[in-house]
Amino acid sequence: MSFNSHRRMLLDESQPFSHRASHARSCALLVSRKVGLTRDAIIELVQSKTSVDLHAPQSAGELLIALEELENMRLTR
């Protein structure tokens, strides 16, 4: 699936939170492939910039914050 497909699923509030979090990590994987880093490195960068741990997000709001950072990384690198 593409970044945008995972993004849509992450934003779908009818999906269980755990599935939405999984789609956020899939977005991180696709960003990592684009910029040449590992998925874990991207997740660490997101956490350092936003304080959101994508391995254990606490709320839908955190997922949105992380998504915004992932989109910025995707477009600026």
Label for each model-derived stretch:
Residues 1-77:
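Alpha-helical propensity feature that highlights long, continuous alpha-helices across diverse contexts
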